[in-house]
From Swiss-Prot:
UniProt modified residues of type N6-acetyllysine: 74
Entry similarity comment: Belongs to the class-II aminoacyl-tRNA synthetase family.
Record-linked CDD domains: AlaRS_core
Superkingdom assignment: Bacteria
Provenance organism: Escherichia coli O139:H28 (strain E24377A / ETEC)
Gene name of the record: alaS
This protein's name: Alanine--tRNA ligase
Role according to the record: Catalyzes the attachment of alanine to tRNA(Ala) in a two-step reaction: alanine is first activated by ATP to form Ala-AMP and then transferred to the acceptor end of tRNA(Ala). Also edits incorrectly charged Ser-tRNA(Ala) and Gly-tRNA(Ala) via its editing domain.
Amino acid sequence: MSKSTAEIRQAFLDFFHSKGHQVVASSSLVPHNDPTLLFTNAGMNQFKDVFLGLDKRNYSRATTSQRCVRAGGKHNDLENVGYTARHHTFFEMLGNFSFGDYFKHDAIQFAWELLTSEKWFALPKERLWVTVYESDDEAYEIWEKEVGIPRERIIRIGDNKGAPYASDNFWQMGDTGPCGPCTEIFYDHGDHIWGGPPGSPEEDGDRYIEIWNIVFMQFNRQADGTMEPLPKPSVDTGMGLERIAAVLQHVNSNYDIDLFRTLIQAVAKVTGATDLSNKSLRVIADHIRSCAFLIADGVMPSNENRGYVLRRIIRRAVRHGNMLGAKETFFYKLVGPLIDVMGSAGEDLKRQQAQVEQVLKTEEEQFARTLERGLALLDEELAKLSGDTLDGETAFRLYDTYGFPVDLTADVCRERNIKVDEAGFEAAMEEQRRRAREASGFGADYNAMIRVDSASEFKGYDHLELNGKVTALFVDGKAVDAINAGQEAVVVLDQTPFYAESGGQVGDKGELKGANFSFAVEDTQKYGQAIGHIGKLAAGSLKVGDAVQADVDEARRARIRLNHSATHLMHAALRQVLGTHVSQKGSLVNDKVLRFDFSHNEAMKPEEIRAVEDLVNAQIRRNLPIETNIMDLEAAKAKGAMALFGEKYDERVRVLSMGDFSTELCGGTHASRTGDIGLFRIISESGTAAGVRRIEAVTGEGAITTVHADSDRLSEVAHLLKGDSNNLADKVRSVLERTRQLEKELQQLKEQAAAQESANLSSKAIDVNGVKLLVSELSGVEPKMLRTMVDDLKNQLGSTIIVLATVAEGKVSLIAGVSKDVTDRVKAGELIGMVAQQVGGKGGGRPDMAQAGGTDAAALPAALASVKGWVSAKLQ
């Protein structure tokens, strides 16, 4: 009996654990501190800084099953999903890693043992082929002489991409940095399937399928292209879980493995589909995985960056559900079946199931309102099409008006063998794309490119002043030996009391100083293991190796500490008041305010906001001790410590506890006791995205300032109402009631005046071919009274055509009325349109009543004068 996908995942991790590897949990799909990457798309992403030497772990061997997304950006599989056997937006990458530990020999032997041993995967050895980089004789000989693979099944792959070291079998992180040859393992499905071995003209067939890529990082590529051997070479491997599951379960398509069969059946059930071979079922089964896990990792549907990619995937799934005949919202109903089929890998998703379902349901409902109209428009345009390409302007209109991502439009067109003019679409989108790029923060940032070999020791938990030594200087992202007065720079010290921005807490400000210089620190950021002090040299000069005194702005840090501790109390209070579905989706803690984004599906009620405030202030009055402990990550989670969205944690973590009320993982700076916070006040609650709310709050002196401001406002209002704050509500109610009564009386007077004006106007009507025509500009009449006057005049005049106008604040208001016995010859909508056009406006309405507005008051007399001639022509 073949292994299930869940069993294959566990077997892989168990095998490498038995070989001394640390089992590391999958990192978030949102890469940590890597603006170059849209989504986590490979197992090595979370170890990138380790390979670059910027981070150190307490293990040298690791194994993971990493959740990955490839949709948007450089790695984009979206358009192929549903049309091929192996493309997915979401997949799991099984990997084993060596950080300067074992190398080629052990990496190859481990792979061979796992794949072929009867205890593990037991694949037939004769079905396995391998490739090596053309000049990697070492790997070739290991495969041939130690493993025993015949020469005819070992294929050398050279530089096949037009440049030295540009090969399918040579991996590189970028233009410079760690790189090296790789060896790939292929499985031969048999000659009943078309395709040839790797490197052959038929290699794109489905007979020979790559199942494992083993990268040997043994060189450091220099800017001039030279390859320097790394002192401690490393190993990075990746094997797609879905691909190896297809091999072990003896199927040729990833969509035929147990995991997808179960999901496809669930999709069929919620959409009412009966043909299980329909490609739309495969699309939806794939898309629920990427969408659900992206939302669980904090991504929300939006029109920018990661949120827009998520929205595109959701809408593509909804459209395929529409094709299957789904009559109601269905997509969110697949989260439960997904959790069931993912097994232990779905535990994070299960904790957030209600939130994920609500976000998906809301997004589907919003898109459903425009989907049918958009598809109808697209059908109309395609029916009129004479060629085989839909113009970019129409594609953009579908996006702008109906929310159709261009790839969804392309999806529909492809089914009819029609292309989309994507260049034209991009031209129409360019301005919006430029704005999105600017807003995203994904633009150029010299400091983001800084790479520091040294590490900084943070001593800011216990010190606000400290002596240190300059270990590196950077100007515009480039290392320099010295800086002079007036230069902006990043200064790295061997030890520092300055806190670098992390966990939502902003970086410290302060001063680095010596006998002959002063450097104003405006921000503090992390660069790998180093801490960079960002600012400007105010006086003197500073060079690498200089001793400095580092002074943190103590008052600012104190305010930040209070706000950060209050954030923890509020998080716990929200979970008590609203429910345990609340989880952090983002935060900002500075010296003025704390901002907290959290999962919740509706606006908080006033009584809920008050309950959270009261609960936090109760903990402040308890004056609970705020304590920190260092412990293993798993032990901390077992203790109930909450981990924060978007943060990457080491194996040893700092656990912050506030009595029995709050326990979280946190590396930030905090008060000593909750009583130090003094007072907590929520100043706003709002929505930021579907299923995400935002609270802003203040503490300490900031909270007291808001109390004083509220008191001052109440005193001012009480003075204006000639009362005091004790009976202010009664005073306001009395004023409002009196105001409503006066407004009612005023409206009655206006109606009486309008009726009198109508009576006066009726005598000014003239006869045009047996119909009474009345055209008049009125002064001192509110625009909204014109309609009442027209109704009165129609009752008085019988067969009639009426045009009334008034000007208020430079804007023209027009209304036309036509008695029903005349509407077969004169229509009010046409008449008002003719007049409005002359005063720079437009309007419309029914044949018997229409209204309009305009901006050119000076043209009004001439426009009204033209009515008689126009009507006469119509009545002849």
